[in-house]
Amino acid sequence: VVGVRCMNVGGLGMDVDVLVRCKKGRFVKGKIKYLLSLLQSLFTFKGYEIEIESGERRETHKALIAVACNGTQIGGGIRICPASVIDDGKIDVMAVECMGKAQIVKAFLYLMKGKVLDYPAAEHFLCERVKIVPSLPCTVQLDGELYDGLEFDARIERGLKMYR
């Protein structure tokens, strides 16, 4: 992603909103801090208007979450894109539509179970390069690190050898 390396997952959405809230929280520590931030986000997050561009493909979303993945998991083991294969030379793009408060909770439950690809408002595709353009500036995360004002233009760099 423009000037910053990302090995696993980069994106924006409610997951980033939770991380931003955790970073701001001062009085509570550990898992409780994360859970409180998550609860706040579940009830206040409104989604991001974004455009996803990849080759000839152009689509707009009101995204609960939008990610470009090489790996399968974010955070403490949340399987954001179970179909992702780290050594296939492709970026897995996942976008989940934000469709109201009740649906946010439902989508989150699919996410926590690792079944987000089964969620009706989730979209997944493979590509070699993707741009995710929010209508307003927002914070993005790359491998869990937060960046403000970063242009999200991701591509696969070849060269890393994977041994299993």
Model-assigned labels for residue ranges:
Residues 1-64:
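Catalytic core of DAGKc-family lipid kinases
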Residues 9, 20-21, 68, 96, ...:
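Short beta-strand-to-turn element immediately C-terminal to the catalytic PLP-Schiff-base lysine
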Residues 11, 15, 67-81, 146:
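Glycine-rich phosphate/pyrophosphate-binding beta-alpha loops
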Residues 15-18, 60-62, 74-77, 101-104:
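Short acidic/glycine-rich loop or secondary-structure boundary segments that cap or lie
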Residues 26-33, 76, 82-103:
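Gly/Ser/Thr-rich active-site loops/lids in small-molecule metabolic enzymes
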Residues 36-39, 48-55, 76-81, 115-118, ...:
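Glycine-rich, charged/polar anion/phosphate-binding loops
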Residues 54-56, 60, 85, 95-164:
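ATP/nucleoside-binding phosphotransfer catalytic cores, i.e., glycine-rich phosphate-binding loops
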